[in-house]
């Protein structure tokens, strides 16, 4: 969460916010997260930039994930961070890197690729 504060904002649409929060509350995921995690994510979303969707995107093998691609394209995102394999297989999507959360936590370089240390 500090990375977002230092390096730029988080983008959202009402649909991406709702789906992200719903996924994090699934029992098999919520049981692995610290109690304050969901509150922290909600705090991030409260400061996120709301992006209007002007250009629809239909590209993902799971159509429910197209909303995240639409957000990235319409918001000119620097990257997409996800653990969803249906999105990860599209890396990069229209020049936007798609990385998993572990790569994001390790830190990313200016081009959106994991830094080498």
Predicted regions and their residues:
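PIN/NYN-family metal-dependent endoribonuclease catalytic core
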Residues: 1-27
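Hydrophobic/aromatic ligand-binding patch that stacks against planar heteroaromatic rings
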Residues: 2, 71, 90
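Short secondary-structure boundary segments
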Residues: 14-15, 83-85
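Membrane interface segments of multi-pass transport proteins and intramembrane proteases
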Residues: 29-33
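Mid-chain, well-packed structural core segment of small domains
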Residues: 46-81
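Acidic, PIN/NYN-like endoribonuclease modules and their adjacent C-terminal/linker elements
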Residues: 58, 62, 75, 79, ...
């Amino acid at each position: 969460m500090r990375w977002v504060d230092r390096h730029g904002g988080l983008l959202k649409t009402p649909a991406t916010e709702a789906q992200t929060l719903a996924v994090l509350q699934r029992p098999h995921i919520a049981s692995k997260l610290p109690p304050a995690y969901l509150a922290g994510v909600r705090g991030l979303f409260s400061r996120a930039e709301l992006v209007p969707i002007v250009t629809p995107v239909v590209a993902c093998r799971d159509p429910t994930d197209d909303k995240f691609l639409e957000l990235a394209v319409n918001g000119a995102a620097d990257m997409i961070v996800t653990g969803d394999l249906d999105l990860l297989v599209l890396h990069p999507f229209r020049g936007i890197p798609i990385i998993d959360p572990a790569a994001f936590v390790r830190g990313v370089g200016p081009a959106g690729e994991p830094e080498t240390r």
